[in-house]
Amino acid sequence: MRKVAAAAVVTLLVAALVTSVGVRRVTAHLAHGATAPEFALQAAQGGDVATVDLKEALAKGPVVLYFFPKSFTSGCTTEAHLFSEHIADFKKLNATVIGVSGDDIETQKKFSTEACRSAFRVASDPGLKVAKLYDAQLADKYANRTSYVIAQDGTIAYAYTDLDAAKHVDNTLDALKSLSAARK
């Protein structure tokens, strides 16, 4: 019960932050064609921890990099579930999915199994250093809900920012399909 109440409070705080920072900040992200900043972060998948490196992930194909405000809040859990439910679709497009928030790695270990269903890596970005590089910081302690599709050449192929988690999966899948069609 306390976790539910705490999650509700965090959700309300994030909503209040969105209101206070204004529309411009909520919709900011790196531009199409920009070079994606390289990074390496500790990440969890299925409760196991390893380093996730953008350069290594891009060697295998495009990367869907999505930032979210806080693990175990309702919107972030919903978004993680949606990504996990569609992981086979991402794999068909040879894409790697990586989730990122400012939560510590111990929290991400649990989130990777419970919310992400062990389907993809979820990284810990303490201090939101990587979120800042990607113009995905909502407030001091929270990343914005921003999704990127990074082409294999390391450029931003698609960017989408919206605190409503519902469209991030469909939009990134559509962007990957367009990217795949353009390569043919």
Model-based region annotation:
Residues 37, 62, 144-146:
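Short loop/turn microsegments at loop-to-beta-strand junctions
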Residues 143-184:
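Thiol-/selenol-based redox modules, centered on thioredoxin-like
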